[in-house]
């Protein structure tokens, strides 16, 4: 089913169980990445800095900011490593990880079965994100099905390409979300589909986007995970308790608030309750 409508409480145990099961299927042999991080005290993390509350450039300081940036820095702090942020794009982020240009990916890349077959990942998700479409307020598009046979902009490598293709839309894929959104404003497509956490704040807070609205419900909501290379079980095992504790302590909820992510994710509340109950 393309558009998820099930309650968060029912979905999270299923998703979490699936993630843990798939991680267990990866190689159990020791990996070199964790050894390298511990020896060099450097952690290379690929992040998207294309704008929005998960990753962008602060216009005042010209430094990276966002929830993904905060999470990368917190992982580095707990590992005793200096964090080197490496900007990536949807079109090249997997290659950067596979080629060893980064140790981890925290790059707006939600879990899918296809991605789980070629990469490794920390089993506990740190967020849950679905897609939405920005369309003109006077557009006749009111449902996802209305996009059939219409030109729709998105990013290359986006997890939304597959469900959009199944809806029968004409995909126009760009290197970044910024280019995709610019194409929408240039009337090159009838909608631009990206993470709801990017689209919603943009439409709510930016004057030049006041003529646009977002579609609901979210398209294909999925868990956001930290990606590793396949078979790096040591790295995953080292990071998973950290992510659980960030849920239990409320750090991730605080990071969501600090970065003004709206609407707030009910998944974070559910995961916090779970790990507090489990004593994680």
Regions flagged by a language model, labelled:
Residues 66-78, 141, 145-146, 150-151, ...:
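Extended ligand-binding regions for polar small-molecule ligands
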Residues 31, 81-85, 109-111, 115, ...:
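A conserved helix-loop-strand patch within extracytoplasmic ligand-binding domains
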Residues 30-108:
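Extracytoplasmic small-molecule ligand-binding "clamshell" domains
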Residues 49, 127-135, 196, 200, ...:
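Periplasmic-binding protein-like
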Residues 34, 66-67, 116-126, 212-216, ...:
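A structural signal for short loop-to-beta-strand junctions that line the ligand-binding cleft
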Residues 84-95, 157, 172-186, 220-222:
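Short helix-initiation/N-cap motifs at beta->coil->alpha
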Residues 31, 159-175, 211-214, 243-280:
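Ligand-binding clefts/hinges and TM-proximal coupling segments of bilobed small-molecule sensing domains
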Residues 95, 109-117, 163-166, 190-220:
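A ligand-binding cleft/hinge motif common to bilobed small-molecule-binding domains
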């Amino acid at each position: 089913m393309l558009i998820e409508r099930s309650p968060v409480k029912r979905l999270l145990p299923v998703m979490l169980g699936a993630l843990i099961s798939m991680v267990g299927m990866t190689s159990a042999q020791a990996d070199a990445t964790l050894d390298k991080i511990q020896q060099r005290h450097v952690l290379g993390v690929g992040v998207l800095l294309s704008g929005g509350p998960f990753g962008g450039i602060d216009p005042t300081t010209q430094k990276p900011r966002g929830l993904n940036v905060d999470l990368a820095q917190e992982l580095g702090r707990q590992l005793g490593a200096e964090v080197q942020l490496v900007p990536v794009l949807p079109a090249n982020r997997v290659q950067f990880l596979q080629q060893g240009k980064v140790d981890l990916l925290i790059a707006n890349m939600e879990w899918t079965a296809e991605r789980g077959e070629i990469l490794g990942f920390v089993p506990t998700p740190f967020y849950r994100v679905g897609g939405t479409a920005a369309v003109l307020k006077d557009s006749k598009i009111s449902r996802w099905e209305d996009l059939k046979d219409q030109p729709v902009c998105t990013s290359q490598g986006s997890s939304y390409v597959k469900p959009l293709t199944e809806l029968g839309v004409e995909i126009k894929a760009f290197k970044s979300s910024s280019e995709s959104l610019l194409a929408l404003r240039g009337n090159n497509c009838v909608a631009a589909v990206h993470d709801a956490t990017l689209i919603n704040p943009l439409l709510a807070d930016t004057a030049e986007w006041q003529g646009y609205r977002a579609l609901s419900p979210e398209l294909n909501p999925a868990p956001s995970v930290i990606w590793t290379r396949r078979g790096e079980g040591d790295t995953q095992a080292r990071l998973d308790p950290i992510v659980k504790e960030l849920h239990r302590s409320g750090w991730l909820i605080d990071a969501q608030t600090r970065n003004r992510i709206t609407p707030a994710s009910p998944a974070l509340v559910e995961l916090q309750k779970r790990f507090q109950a489990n004593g994680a």
